[in-house]
């Protein structure tokens, strides 16, 4: 795995985590 695909994977993980955190926060749990 090269550095570009590794950076894309990390970016997708952070984006998915932040998005789910916003949805989870808005649901009031």
UniProtKB/Swiss-Prot annotation:
It comes from the Eukaryota. One of its GO terms (cellular component) is cytochrome b6f complex. InterPro entries: Cytochr_b6-f_cplx_su8_sf, Cytochrome_b6-f_cplx_su8. GO terms for molecular function: electron transporter, transferring electrons within cytochrome b6/f complex of photosystem II activity. GO terms for biological process: cytochrome complex assembly; photosynthesis. The keyword Magnesium does not apply. Pfam families: PetN. The chain crosses the membrane at residues 3-23. It is a single-pass membrane protein. SUPFAM superfamilies: PetN subunit of the cytochrome b6f complex. Keywords: Electron transport, Membrane, Photosynthesis, Plastid, Transmembrane, Transmembrane helix, Transport. It is found in: Plastid membrane. The keyword Plastid applies. The 4 large subunits of the cytochrome b6-f complex are cytochrome b6, subunit IV (17 kDa polypeptide, PetD), cytochrome f and the Rieske protein, while the 4 small subunits are PetG, PetL, PetM and PetN. The complex functions as a dimer. Component of the cytochrome b6-f complex, which mediates electron transfer between photosystem II (PSII) and photosystem I (PSI), cyclic electron flow around PSI, and state transitions. Belongs to the PetN family. This is Cytochrome b6-f complex subunit 8.
